[in-house]
Amino acid sequence: MGLLAFLKTQFVLHLLVGFVFVVSGLVINFVQLCTLALWPVSKQLYRRLNCRLAYSLWSQLVMLLEWWSCTECTLFTDQATVERFGKEHAVIILNHNFEIDFLCGWTMCERFGVLGSSKVLAKKELLYVPLIGWTWYFLEIVFCKRKWEEDRDTVVEGLRRLSDYPEYMWFLLYCEGTRFTETKHRVSMEVAAAKGLPVLKYHLLPRTKGFTTAVKCLRGTVAAVYDVTLNFRGNKNPSLLGILYGKKYEADMCVRRFPLEDIPLDEKEAAQWLHKLYQEKDALQEIYNQKGMFPGEQFKPARRPWTLLNFLSWATILLSPLFSFVLGVFASGSPLLILTFLGFVGAASFGVRRLIGVTEIEKGSSYGNQEFKKKE
């Protein structure tokens, strides 16, 4: 193990990275709160500013993937599709099998200039997660309780509000509704069999309401649906903790573009289209498991320096006063002050670990274990 690889495994460095992310996030959230005064004056200016503020926070996580762990991402698609990236509004459909699938999506958003304006249909619980949920609130992210009777009006209103968004946005949908686990897959396939739908090997049964509603509400705004099927070489199952420890992964993403006009207007037909899409995604995963790669041309978009420069800027601003403060605490010789500081460090470490826990599969929601048995 080289010196750099050794340093990446050290708890103290993890604490410093976490400190920069949390404190910069709180600063960004405060500035976002102040920008609310702009909404009545210029809604579009408010949106543009918040896209850049969100970028300053999200890009720190992307930096960990691209520069800290040096994880590589390869696209399997065609040249015509690549040329449209970042130049149109799009709905993204991504499989939800991995703890860092969102991070791989974000790194592609960053490389094509839409990270700050990226959107997602997110579960309501995430709204209350510090930094993440707060930042999303100011970005007009659409939240749902995953109970369609209660969500319908909220989701429709949130989607329609995005129809005049001033920056190109990629709107992410996890159509499976929850992250893949063996238990959820078994329950999901029982439902598929009961409904006469083809059994999926690598995905859960897609929940169609969110997709058909998004397509309906964003028609005229969104130009296409990008179907993204993600997997990792070497049968790896990466985690955010692994990224933090500097582990390098190799992500492969098969991207297919479907013009929105090719998706049926009728809700039932659109739902059937989505089910067919997931059968195709399942077939793509089977090909990957057999051949170790997806079909199509390979593209490796170059990582950009902005994520690293953004993090280094925040680190320079925040760590200098932190080091001065720590030196002052220990120089004081006060046992009470030192113990108080160490207690704060422990609490901060616990808080950062809880944030990471949001991404972990074993700590994910139980949604899907029984929900598939209910009528969608």
UniProtKB/Swiss-Prot annotation:
GO terms for biological process: CDP-diacylglycerol biosynthetic process; phosphatidic acid biosynthetic process; phospholipid biosynthetic process. SUPFAM superfamilies: Glycerol-3-phosphate (1)-acyltransferase. The keyword Acyltransferase applies. Pathway: Phospholipid metabolism; CDP-diacylglycerol biosynthesis; CDP-diacylglycerol from sn-glycerol 3-phosphate: step 2/3. It is a multi-pass membrane protein. One of its GO terms (cellular component) is plasma membrane. Widely expressed with highest levels in testis, pancreas and kidney, followed by spleen, lung, adipose tissue and liver. Converts 1-acyl-sn-glycerol-3-phosphate (lysophosphatidic acid or LPA) into 1,2-diacyl-sn-glycerol-3-phosphate (phosphatidic acid or PA) by incorporating an acyl moiety at the sn-2 position of the glycerol backbone. Acts on LPA containing saturated or unsaturated fatty acids C16:0-C20:4 at the sn-1 position using C18:1, C20:4 or C18:2-CoA as the acyl donor. Also acts on lysophosphatidylcholine, lysophosphatidylinositol and lysophosphatidylserine using C18:1 or C20:4-CoA. Has a preference for arachidonoyl-CoA as a donor. This is 1-acyl-sn-glycerol-3-phosphate acyltransferase gamma. The lineage of its organism: Eukaryota, Metazoa, Chordata, Craniata, Vertebrata.
